[in-house]
Amino acid sequence: MEDTKPRSLDFVERYHVAQHRAGSLPYITIIGLMIHPDFNQMVFNIRNNVDRLMREHPVLVAAIDDTDSRRLRWIINNNEPPFVTDQYLLHPVIDANRHPVSGPADVASIEDGEAQEFNLNQGPLWRVAVYKPKLRCPVTHYIALTVHHVVADSIGALNLFEDILRPHSVNHDPGLERSLPPKAKKTMRIQPSITGIIKKGVQSILNHKSSWKVTRGHGVTIKWPPPSLLKAPPRKPDVSHFSLDLRKDQHRVVERLEALGDHTGSIHSLLHTAAVIALTAATANDIFHTIDTETPKSLRSEDLTHPRIGGNYTGLIERSIPRWKLGRYTMASFTKKFNDYIHSPEGESEARSNMGELLLVPDRIIPNFWKSSLEKTATSGDPYRHSLSISNIGRFDPKDIVGLEKVWFCHASMP
């Protein structure tokens, strides 16, 4: 592998490490149902792709140094990674043991447990596993990719998933110089508000060591958590299943979700989205006149190019659409119109202005406001929040991936 220059973690990457250290490991799992006549050939192809990706993208073999300090740096493992890839040994990234499972929920449960074993100080911070469905034909398998958020966010994970499954004969663009992904601030065009700039400046001054002698820590709200306050990750995965019977529970959606929140301690925006969609679908009256959408938009600039594998920082585009307008379009034409706006200069400007500033990582516990927020949303006149086919996991283009039947997306809950 080519050598590359080390660099410190940016604010977003540090936030993911802080989540990990706080006992809420942020990861993404993508599961694909594959039908392939030759299991050995399928695994051989996956292995070749994984090894190539590890050579091309240093972040896939990197680790993180000195996680007990705020000055985190990537460990460059390009030439001598602490894990060995050998055709006669167990692969450090691929688990091809074909564990028998009943379905994708079982896969998600196992992957959750494996993700808890990710070692920030050593790596690798991603894995690929092959599972065998119990009730399907012998040529059917689940392929699971699990990636730590510090390596790639959801959009980067989808690109990685595609590259792992593509036939080895497909030509690949060598891309840019083989280096770690650049810092977020070097790849984004954002338009922070004046208030945000002032707030960040004051915050930085208060947190500077030279200011502590004068302020004695007054106003300091941000500090890297010391090892004594760390929370150990769960040793056993805890994957919960939750369902709503709209015929019985259409007036208890918020109550049921509150019960779920009391049990799990957090709720993911995907569950929020599913709940309000179900609430709208279960409502027979005409009180919902407008559909509100929020769609993540890449903040990468075309002139500030970056590797495909390495994540993608996003800002939100929010739109309100009168329901009567939907009758003028097919789903395809309406989605295209919405997509055109997202990729227009106006849409990009909206996402950049909503982004504001990337702030430092706080060490205090953030209050759990999701209950009151969801209660307010569910009782509003237009609680529908959905981004149609433009989702926060990006567009998945399975061309050249023969035998891929279905894809599931799993996400660790946010603290």
Locate predicted features:
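C-terminal accessory segments of proteins
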Residues: 233-235, 354-360, 391-392, 397-413
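Helical lid/core segments from catalytic subdomains that handle acyl or acyl-like groups
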Residues: 313-396
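Acidic/polar loop patches that form or flank catalytic/metal-binding clefts of enzymes
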Residues: 268-269, 286-289, 347-354
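Structured loops at beta-to-helix junctions and adjacent beta-edge loops in soluble globular domains
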Residues: 131, 146-148, 296-298, 391-393
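Acyl/amide activation-and-transfer machinery of modular secondary-metabolite enzymes
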Residues: 21-36, 71-99, 125, 234-243, ...
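Flexible, P/S/T/G-rich "lid" or insertion loops adjacent to the active sites of thioester-utilizing
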Residues: 203-265
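Non-catalytic N-terminal regions of enzymes
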Residues: 1-189, 193, 266-287, 398-415
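Secretion/export-associated helical scaffolds and adjacent low-complexity Pro/Gly/Ser/Thr-rich regions
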Residues: 172-225
